[in-house]
Amino acid sequence: MTKYIFVTGGVVSSLGKGITAASLGRLLKNRGLNVTIQKFDPYINVDPGTMSPYQHGEVFVTDDGAETDLDLGHYERFIDINLNKYSNVTTGKIYSSVLQKERRGEYLGGTVQVIPHITNEIKERVYRSGRETNADVVITEIGGTVGDIESLPFLEAIRQIKSDIGRDNVMYIHCTLIPYLKAAGEMKTKPTQHSVKELRSLGIQPNIIVVRTELPVSQDMKDKLALFCDIDTKAVIEARDADTLYAVPLSLQEQNMDQIVCDHLKLDNPAADMTDWTALVNKVRNLSKKTKIALVGKYVELQDAYISVVEALRHAGYSFDTDVEVKWVNAEHVTAENVKELVGDTDGILVPGGFGDRGVEGKIVAIQYARENKVPFLGICLGMQLASIEFARNVLGLEGANSSEINPDTPYAIIDLLPEQKDVEDLGGTLRLGLYPCKLAEETNAYNAYNEPVVYERHRHRYEFNNQFRPDMEKAGFVFSGTSPDGRLVEIIELQDHPWFVAAQFHPELVSRPNRPQPLFHDFVSASITNKESK
């Protein structure tokens, strides 16, 4: 029978529930269990696709095209699995589904209420995740903080699940904070006690408490928490700030967290073999070289907006025993006069994805600098589109060339709407989303990176390269190294007389793993290291 683990949070948000859930998933997978994982977000948006990155951070796209929470990126990178649309559930999705059922008459004239209809829909999403993946264990992270009004239906639903399928098949893990009061010189357990009290008042008794802390938690403090929260002392798990996220699974294993979980759920799988993971962490902690990459974006104040990009750069660096330092460059501040000052000390330049016109001209200036000064360049999504526009303006001399997204009246729409997008009015969930094939041209940097004729990558865009400009740009040295299999859509572009200048319409960062870097990132970092060594 499938086992279910629920991870909740208390006291404050951003405690690392997602990393805790992902780390536990890795430990259980290494015990030979088939693990899947999901995130429940209590906001009323159907998905984060139209939310500002300042509000939500990065939008992570799954193979099947779901726009999801950035925690799914952590899940995939840690557990090394590909998740799907069932892995992220929001209040908006739940209510939308229930209202559609009501309109179809599925409730037989009954009064539709939070209990049982909303809670039943939530439970169905939990069970479906296990069914669709044939999982031994389903880990579900509940977003928000215990005590929030928005979270109540989710907490009630997961309370009911224990009654539905039995205590041996359900486990609750609660993540809290033990703050250190500098003035008093002591750590305080009271916020954790009150958070657990709130959770218990809702009918949920946590089996494990994971306490986030800056300093070591004494045995006396663990005993106190165990007494007041009614759990075993060994089930108080310390989550200290780590020098690398990838060390967290090893810290949890040292405290026997995965064994406690298996004992409670009556799973007799052998201990997790973390030899390879330990080797990875040791490598990360002992990188001997450095390279600096400029990330030119418009959300640089909130680095979570580009979290998968940064992780993909780091993964690539691990292959070369290199610590990749990211220099955050606000695209709105970049001009032709100061671009050298802002990016001249870096070994490579990356322009990530985005929407809208803010910061676009600054990104184009940075791309021009990379092209003219032979600096390794990687463009992603909008970065690929702007690389095309920069070439059209400054090499072909098409003054005013632009994207019809940025300037609908441009005389040269190098980037235009996909034909199937012309009549689309809704913004949410209507992009070209998910995994699509890309055919690679031989004897190109793209082909050399993948060493395969056809690859599959995840997309999230509405605009595409305008094919009427293809012949002129090819004549001028612009290489279309990746297209859709029918040749209609441009997927990857690069330059002929440049050491390494590649840009992709898709989002390669989404499939990178710490032990398996994404090929374009791998070769981009390699080219950046070579550039540094040649200076």
From Swiss-Prot:
CDD domains: CTPS_N, GATase1_CTP_Synthase. PROSITE patterns: GATASE_TYPE_1 (PS51273). GO terms for cellular component: cytosol. This is CTP synthase. The active site is at 381 (nucleophile), 507, 509. Mg(2+) binds at residues 71, 141. CTP binds at residues 13, 148-150, 188-193, 224. It catalyses: UTP + L-glutamine + ATP + H2O = CTP + L-glutamate + ADP + phosphate + 2 H(+); L-glutamine + H2O = L-glutamate + NH4(+); UTP + NH4(+) + ATP = CTP + ADP + phosphate + 2 H(+). Homotetramer. ATP binds at residues 14-19, 71, 240-242. Pathway: Pyrimidine metabolism; CTP biosynthesis via de novo pathway; CTP from UDP: step 2/2. Residues 1-267 are annotated as: Amidoligase domain. Allosterically activated by GTP, when glutamine is the substrate; GTP has no effect on the reaction when ammonia is the substrate. The allosteric effector GTP functions by stabilizing the protein conformation that binds the tetrahedral intermediate(s) formed during glutamine hydrolysis. Inhibited by the product CTP, via allosteric rather than competitive inhibition. It is an enzyme of class 6 (ligase). Gene3D superfamilies: 3.40.50.880, P-loop containing nucleotide triphosphate hydrolases. It comes from the Bacteria. PANTHER family: CTP SYNTHASE (PTHR11550), CTP SYNTHASE-RELATED (PTHR11550:SF0). CTPSs have evolved a hybrid strategy for distinguishing between UTP and CTP. The overlapping regions of the product feedback inhibitory and substrate sites recognize a common feature in both compounds, the triphosphate moiety. To differentiate isosteric substrate and product pyrimidine rings, an additional pocket far from the expected kinase/ligase catalytic site, specifically recognizes the cytosine and ribose portions of the product inhibitor. Belongs to the CTP synthase family. It comes from Bacillus mycoides (strain KBAB4) (Bacillus weihenstephanensis). Its EC number is 6.3.4.2. Catalyzes the ATP-dependent amination of UTP to CTP with either L-glutamine or ammonia as the source of nitrogen. Regulates intracellular CTP levels through interactions with the four ribonucleotide triphosphates. Keywords: ATP-binding, Glutamine amidotransferase, Ligase, Magnesium, Metal-binding, Nucleotide-binding, Pyrimidine biosynthesis. UTP binds at residues 13, 188-193, 224. Pfam families: CTP_synth_N (PF06418), GATase (PF00117). GO terms for molecular function: ATP binding; CTP synthase activity; glutaminase activity; identical protein binding; metal ion binding. The gene is pyrG.
